[in-house]
Amino acid sequence: MDIQTLEIVRKANRLTNELGTNDPHKIARELGIEVIPLSFKKQRGAYKVLMRNRFIFIKDDLHPVMERIVMLHEIGHDALHREEAVKAGGFKEFNIFDMRQSRMEYEANIFASQISLPDDEILEYIENGLKVIDV
């Protein structure tokens, strides 16, 4: 694991440890990020800072599992890229599953995946004899 990825993992772990949860809606609420459901056509979510207020806009008809992933991804942008979001202005659409497209998307995905399934939880699964297919 490279230094940059390790720092993202540490930041995700610190956040969940400080807040005592990995629930994205609770995390957003604790961080003061307003979550607004929208009827996006294609885009699943977006993170935006407007006049120092932080927002996550989320597609209103996502499956709960996908909503969780997208929410954690957007929280990753808040934790890692808030300054870039302030400078960027409008919405920018990226495919969150194509990490080759953007460094920021890659980093937000690492952040989201660490909160979704932290290393210690993976180790617990392995120690209990579970396989990837079981998880």
Write out the residue ranges for each language-model feature.
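Active-site hotspot residues in diverse enzymes, especially metal/ion-binding acidic/histidine motifs
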Residues: 1-135
